[in-house]
């Protein structure tokens, strides 16, 4: 720093005075006192409240303003070379642990009384303030580029902000000291975990690099051009550049980038200055200006420009919102903009510095919106008059969201202006800490390059995207498509994490340097990428998806689990191990035994040694293997990854555990960093099927399965507006299993009749509860078994009557009706045959899909259904084609390899199926549980009119049931011939609400009023239940 600027500690008294001239206007009255006392730079850095009072600064607010600016100078003087993201994380972690230790020490003292509700002591609040100050310093780094553009750091920033807000709320709550301390301890532990996560990312060069200073000179500035910089000021006086305008002097020098802090202007330190004083300093010399900028870490490669160094854009006021040519990479301004002469202090947070104005800007309204005329001028691309608002006003929001404006076949990239911002907000707060930043403005056009993804995978996933944004080079390379989505989850065929898979929201971009990205494209695509591809232009794209045909060859090669234990061969280490499952309920098994095979630094596990497909695998070089001392199970070890998840295993004996640990460490140690998993391979993959298994010992009190546990195809997950958002918790593995089961079912229905129906897989059996919630399959029908076992297994499907066929293949809407109104009526003679066939009522053997009860579903052909049921929308037919092609690709080499399932304990499986179906061993329905009551309100029908009627029916049924209970209580009293006054008084006190309700209802016996009251209650209940359905 000594070569670029003189340290603040060596300032002379005249330099201190020059620096104070740029502070707030209210502080100018004290400059003479500083000049008279000859305060040097070293004295300035160590100044205190008492010394300020001796200098005549008697007001506390003025003292705080000076000390805030001095704090910024201290950070610049002492922390420039040592401050980085890791050190700031260490400081925050230390502050959190200090606060924890302080609370623990207070509780150990003999005078501690946690039951009091008095205010916390001052030393306690001081520790809280120190913790928040350390968090602010960390947020000052996370809140701007390059960290603000990385998803992981953006999520971390949001977590830290949320925890700090929670901490400030806790200390102001009126509760006991013990409760307050418990809440603060929880926040401190969470903050420590966040800091440990940042510290663990030591391999990321951005975490360990510190900031540096750089001197930039802008010369030959034209009077009509201006500097072309966007500057945003924090409340305490940091000045951050948020971008440059296209072809401006700041853009042409190629050294000014978003996130840079302005430290000096013409060798005068401007840290802590007002923004208007900074602007005056920039305009002081019309021929040029010398800037000293503080730059955040960008990239490890200093020879190649980082992607963030290409940030430039036109002011939004100069950008017409009309479709642009796909080949135009550089656009020219269509009009000029003037500069404000004077604005209030609250509006000086953001400033664009173009040529001098012809007249003042038009003020905003109280919400900060532009006048309608100006906005209409922007929308149609007309030139803006000279009195228009600064273009940077569009970039001056605290929280900005991007959204798509679709006009015919054009997708535009725009900003949404925040309307809730107050214009009277002060520029500074009273805390002396520094670095409290607002999020920086982001550009309209920028060379963001997303993570590379397999083009075949992107084509397969394209039908699940809601919107597409394409950035294409001048050569129009088809593989360079980067899709952006905001609020959607990708439904993939496996529950696998990929090395390059991150959120594809607009806030996440790759930080690979340009040369590395070029090398990556040339290596994968095999096509040369010239330098012109570094600058991507916006491409209009139609919202119509591309071809929905899936790549058959790519599907078969993606999964590493689709390999049998025999084909895998003898591994480096084999044996039985216990694996801990993610328990979904209290009664579910925590551990399950698998056959494990260690092969080529990958760990596979199978159900048995003859299994045709691995239940899961992990790539060990990406995981850390160690003893799992936190597990209660003996001889446990774990494979953990800070960004993915942890797997826990356990051996039977200590020798087995040591053997596995030694063998795994030997294999993984030989893999160098460059030989680890490639980007298109998986970190890990695991099936969720074992997690849905019920315990081996059935429990009578275990709750039944929820209605929405049957997975849905991806096409139905977000397409229908009537699907609950709660169902998004289903894993992608379950979705894949559901698709494959439907495809196998359809193939067996339309295939040869030589396949025995007893060999149906258990995944095809479904209960009534599953059927209620399950949407249409690819064939548009539900497969439902309603016949007795003897008819379903040992009879030919052609001998079934059309009524039975129609009843066994019901669409979703009819299943809803059948659930509420009873089964569809059969012919009287047929019903008697069914009842008399086994001497009882017909039984349904549609067991839950995860049970081991080996019965089959009826192969009802689609042609036997109701003609109305055969009508499918085009989307369903297209999905059926895609799934058939996918099934054909997946089943290459496996079509004739069906193996016999092992028959389990039929009685045990039957009991388990009855338990999950909420039936007693005698076939009677059990008392509903809380889960059933809760999920009974989220049953949905695809027809909104029918859905509303079903809601009304449920409400009336529940109301009728409640009234019947009240009548039974009343009858109990009225039917008692020996009723005494004392007993009646006790009954009255016990059912006081019911008694008052009776008294009120007896006063109004008018039938019209009663019916209107019922309608009002019903309508209100309908509204309430609709709200619950939307938001639960």
From Swiss-Prot:
It is a peripheral membrane protein. Residues 324-349, 480-509, 682-766, 866-900 are annotated as: Disordered. GO terms for biological process: intracellular signal transduction; postsynapse organization; postsynaptic specialization organization; regulation of signal transduction. Expressed in neurons and localized in the cell body and neurites. It comes from Rattus norvegicus (Rat). It is found in: Cytoplasm; Membrane. This is Connector enhancer of kinase suppressor of ras 2. The modification Phosphoserine is found at residues 12, 338, 390, 685, 687, 756, 767, 906. SMART domains: PDZ, PH, SAM. PANTHER family: CONNECTOR ENCHANCER OF KINASE SUPPRESSOR OF RAS, CONNECTOR ENHANCER OF KINASE SUPPRESSOR OF RAS 2. Belongs to the CNKSR family. One of its GO terms (molecular function) is protein kinase binding. Keywords: Coiled coil, Cytoplasm, Membrane, Phosphoprotein. Residues 11-76 form the SAM domain. The keyword Translocase does not apply. One of its GO terms (cellular component) is cytoplasm.
């Amino acid at each position: 720093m000594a070569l670029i600027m003189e340290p603040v500690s060596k300032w002379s008294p005249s330099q201190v005075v020059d620096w104070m001239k740029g502070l707030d206007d209210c502080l100018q009255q004290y400059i003479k006192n500083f000049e008279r006392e000859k305060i040097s730079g070293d004295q300035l850095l160590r100044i205190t409240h008492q010394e300020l009072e001796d200098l005549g600064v008697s007001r506390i607010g003025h003292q705080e303003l000076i000390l805030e600016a001095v704090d910024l100078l201290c950070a610049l003087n002492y922390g420039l070379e040592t401050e980085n993201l890791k050190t700031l994380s260490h400081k925050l972690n230390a502050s959190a642990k200090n606060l924890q230790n302080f609370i623990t020490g207070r509780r150990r003292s003999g005078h501690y009384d946690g039951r009091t509700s008095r205010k916390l002591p001052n030393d306690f609040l001081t520790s809280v303030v120190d913790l928040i100050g350390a968090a602010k310093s960390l947020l000052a780094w996370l809140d701007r580029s390059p960290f603000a553009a990385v998803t992981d750091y953006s999520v971390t920033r949001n977590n830290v902000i949320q925890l700090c807000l929670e901490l400030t709320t806790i200390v102001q709550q009126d509760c006991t000291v013990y409760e307050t301390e418990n809440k603060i301890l929880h926040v401190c532990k969470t903050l420590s975990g966040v800091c440990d996560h940042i510290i663990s990312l030591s391999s990321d060069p951005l975490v360990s690099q510190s900031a540096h200073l750089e001197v930039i000179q802008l010369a030959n500035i034209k009077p009509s051009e201006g500097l072309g910089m966007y500057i945003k000021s924090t409340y305490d006086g940091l000045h951050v550049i948020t971008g440059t305008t296209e072809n401006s002097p700041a853009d042409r020098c190629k050294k000014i980038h978003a996130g840079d802090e302005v430290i000096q202007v013409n060798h005068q330190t401007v840290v802590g200055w007002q923004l208007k004083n900074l602007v005056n300093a920039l305009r002081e010399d019309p021929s040029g200006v010398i800037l000293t900028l503080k730059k955040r870490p960008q990239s490890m490669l200093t020879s190649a420009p980082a992607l963030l160094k290409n940030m430039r854009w036109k002011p939004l006021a100069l950008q017409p919102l009309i479709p642009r040519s796909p080949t135009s990479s550089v656009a020219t301004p269509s009009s000029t903009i003037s500069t404000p002469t004077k604005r209030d202090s609250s509006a000086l947070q953001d400033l664009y510095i173009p040529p001098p104005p012809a007249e003042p800007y038009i003020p905003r309204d109280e919400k900060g919106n532009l006048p309608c005329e100006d906005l209409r001028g922007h929308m149609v691309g007309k030139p803006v008059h000279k009195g228009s608002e600064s273009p940077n006003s569009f970039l001056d929001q605290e929280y900005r969201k991007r959204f798509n404006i679709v006009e015919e076949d054009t997708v535009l990239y725009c900003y949404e202006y925040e309307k809730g911002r107050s214009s009277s907000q002060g520029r500074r707060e009273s805390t002396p800490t520094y670095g409290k930043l607002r999020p920086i403005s982001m550009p309209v056009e920028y060379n963001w390059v997303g993570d590379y993804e397999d083009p075949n995978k992107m084509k397969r996933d394209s039908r699940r995207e809601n919107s597409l944004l394409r950035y294409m080079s001048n050569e129009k390379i088809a593989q360079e498509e980067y899709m952006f989505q905001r609020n959607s989850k990708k439904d993939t065929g496996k529950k696998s994490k990929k090395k390059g898979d991150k959120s594809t929201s607009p806030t996440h971009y790759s930080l690979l340097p340009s040369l590395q990205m070029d090398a990556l494209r040339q290596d994968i695509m095999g096509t040369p990428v010239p330098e012109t591809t570094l600058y991507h232009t916006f491409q209009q794209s139609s919202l119509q998806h591309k071809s929905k045909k899936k790549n058959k060859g790519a599907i078969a090669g993606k999964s590493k689990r689709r390999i049998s234990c025999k084909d895998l061969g003898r591994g480096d280490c084999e044996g039985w191990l216990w694996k801990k499952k993610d328990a979904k309920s209290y009664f579910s098994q925590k551990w399950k035994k698998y056959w494990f095979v260690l092969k080529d630094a990958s760990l596979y596990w199978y159900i048995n040694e003859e299994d045709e497909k691995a239940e899961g695998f992990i790539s060990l070089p990406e995981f850390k293997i160690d003893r799992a001392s936190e597990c209660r199970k003996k001889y446990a070890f774990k494979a953990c990854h800070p960004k993915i998840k942890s797997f826990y295993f356990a051996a039977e004996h200590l020798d087995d555990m040591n053997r596995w640990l030694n063998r795994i460490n030997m294999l993984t140690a030989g893999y160098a960093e460059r030989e680890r998993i490639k980007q298109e391979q998986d970190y890990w993959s695991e099936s969720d099927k074992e997690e849905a298994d019920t315990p081996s010992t059935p429990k009578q009190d275990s709750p039944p399965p929820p209605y929405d546990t049957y997975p849905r195809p991806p096409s139905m997950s977000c397409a229908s507006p009537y699907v609950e958002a709660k169902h998004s918790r289903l894993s992608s593995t379950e979705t894949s299993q559901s698709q494959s089961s439907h495809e196998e079912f359809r193939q067996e229905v339309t295939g040869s009749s030589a396949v025995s129906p007893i060999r149906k897989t258990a995944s095809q059996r479904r209960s009534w509860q599953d059927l209620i919630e399950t949407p249409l399959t690819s064939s548009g029908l539900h497969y439902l078994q309603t016949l007795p076992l003897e008819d379903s297994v040992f009879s030919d499907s052609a001998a079934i009557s059309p009524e039975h066929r129609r009843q066994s293949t019901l669409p979703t809407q009819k299943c809803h009706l059948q659930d509420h109104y009873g089964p569809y009526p059969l012919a009287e003679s047929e019903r008697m045959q069914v009842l008399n066939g086994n001497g009882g009522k017909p039984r349904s053997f549609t067991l839950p899909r995860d049970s081991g009860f080996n019965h089959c579903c009826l192969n009802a052909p689609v042609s036997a259904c109701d003609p109305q049921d055969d009508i499918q929308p085009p989307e369903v037919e297209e999905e059926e084609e895609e799934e058939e092609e996918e099934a054909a690709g997946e089943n290459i080499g496996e079509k004739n390899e069906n193996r016999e399932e092992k028959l389990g304990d039929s009685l045990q499986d039957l009991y388990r199926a009855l338990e999950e179906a909420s039936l007693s061993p005698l076939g009677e329905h059990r008392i509903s549980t809380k889960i059933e009551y809760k999920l009974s309100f989220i049953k949905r029908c695809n027809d909104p009119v029918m859905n509303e009627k079903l809601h009304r029916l449920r409400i009336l049924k529940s109301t009728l049931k409640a009234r019947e209970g009240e009548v039974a209580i009343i009858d109990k009293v009225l039917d008692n011939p020996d009723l005494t006054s004392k007993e009646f008084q006790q009954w009255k006190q016990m059912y006081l609400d019911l008694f008052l309700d009776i008294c009120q209802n007896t006063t109004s016996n008018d039938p019209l009023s009663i019916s209107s009251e019922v309608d009002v209650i019903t309508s209100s209940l309908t509204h309430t239940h609709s709200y619950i359905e939307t938001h639960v």
